[in-house]
Design a protein with these regions (language model features):
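Pseudouridine synthases involved in rRNA/tRNA modification
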Residues: 1-33, 78, 193, 202-209, ...
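RNA pseudouridine synthases
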Residues: 1-183, 187-192, 266, 286, ...
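Thr-Gly-centered strand-to-loop micro-motif
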Residues: 42-43, 99-100, 147, 198-202, ...
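Short alpha-helix capping/helix-loop boundary micro-motifs
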Residues: 43-48, 220-223, 258
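Short flexible coil/turn linkers enriched for glycine and charged/polar residues
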Residues: 84, 138-139, 165, 206, ...
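Short, well-ordered beta-strand segments enriched in hydrophobic/aromatic residues
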Residues: 88, 224-227
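Long C-terminal interaction/binding lobes of large macromolecular proteins
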Residues: 212
Length: 305
């Protein structure tokens, strides 16, 4: 068993949301299970699952020992951009799930990392997510950093939490954006009627900020660059749909059917910048646009304007 102390400093929020935000790799559902088991206490008393925190609250969380991992190492193609004793940066292909989940028990990036790195992956994220510091969606391609030890994992997670890890994406959106650049500052939370989707909402939401700029305009479409100030689930997809420009191919937040031969959002994690946990140096990694993205641009024809 491991115990952690968590102190609330921000405004009121649900206790399960605080736990999921404060404990790397802990999901909201896992936090709710801990609450139901009485594993979260305040002043020695179990905390109820609907408790709303206030600044200054201090909680003690008892985390169970991880069960032996049943994950299988699989020798899958892995595009390694950089690797050392502390971390590995990979260029994830479109269509690959990051970690095992119901319906995707193998063939994931985690399975590939287990084969490539062996046992040298951090355990902070839990048995289902060894080494995983952050995620990108199945149909999003591009850069992702994984940690090989807990020291690196905690340091990288801290940079994500304080928004000092820079993540740059490129996307193709529907419609022609009027301005050359802009910022979407709109809170994101679970969709009120569809738990598999996210939405711009005020209820149980967290601040989300996306900075975008135009790379090229096409007839009815725009190639853009996005910088994440925060990293909420589906953030770019939700924000661009919110301002009336859903991502090309996004069947969840935009289209009802595939468009331009693309089923799944046209979104690529192009660059990643962070402080190396061991050396303290600022490191930057980039990767080229993948073939599917370049094919989409070719189908759009010549840029306009």
């Amino acid at each position: 068993m491991e115990q952690r102390t968590i102190q609330t400093q921000e405004s009121a929020e649900r206790i399960d949301a605080l736990l999921a935000r404060s404990v790397p790799g802990l999901t909201r559902s896992a936090a709710q299970r801990l609450l139901a088991q009485g594993a979260v206490t305040k002043d020695g008393a179990p905390v109820k699952k609907n408790y709303k925190t206030v600044p200054g609250d201090t909680f003690v969380v008892t985390l169970p020992d991880a069960a032996p991992s049943e994950l299988v190492a699989q020798d899958l193609p892995l595009d390694v951009v950089y690797e050392d004793d502390d971390l590995i940066v990979v260029n994830k292909p479109r269509g690959m799930v990051v970690h095992p989940a119901p319906g995707h028990e193998d063939g994931t990036l985690v399975n590939a990392l287990l084969a490539h790195c062996g046992e040298s992956l951090s355990g902070v994220g839990g048995e289902r997510r060894p080494g995983i510091v952050h995620r990108i969606d199945k149909d999003t391609s591009g850069l992702l950093v994984a940690a090989k030890n807990d020291f690196a994992h905690l340091a990288l997670s801290a940079q994500l939490a304080d928004h000092t890890m820079a993540r740059t994406y490129e996307a193709v959106v529907c419609g022609n954006l009027r301005d050359d650049a802009g910022t979407v500052d709109a809170p994101i939370g679970r969709h009120p009627t569809d738990r598999k989707r996210m939405a711009v909402t005020q209820k149980n939401a967290r601040r989300a900020v996306t900075h975008w700029s135009v790379i090229a305009r096409y007839n009815g479409y725009t190639h853009i660059r996005c910088e994440l100030e925060t990293g909420r689930t589906h953030q770019i997809r939700v924000h661009m749909a919110h301002i009336g420009h859903p991502l090309l191919g996004d069947l969840v937040y935009g289209h009802k059917r595939p468009e331009k031969g693309l089923s799944g959002q046209c979104l690529h994690a192009r660059a990643l910048r962070f402080i190396h946990p061991r050396t303290g140096e600022l490191v930057t990694f980039t990767c080229p646009l993948p073939d599917y993205f370049q094919d989409v641009l070719a189908r759009l024809g010549a840029p306009i304007g």
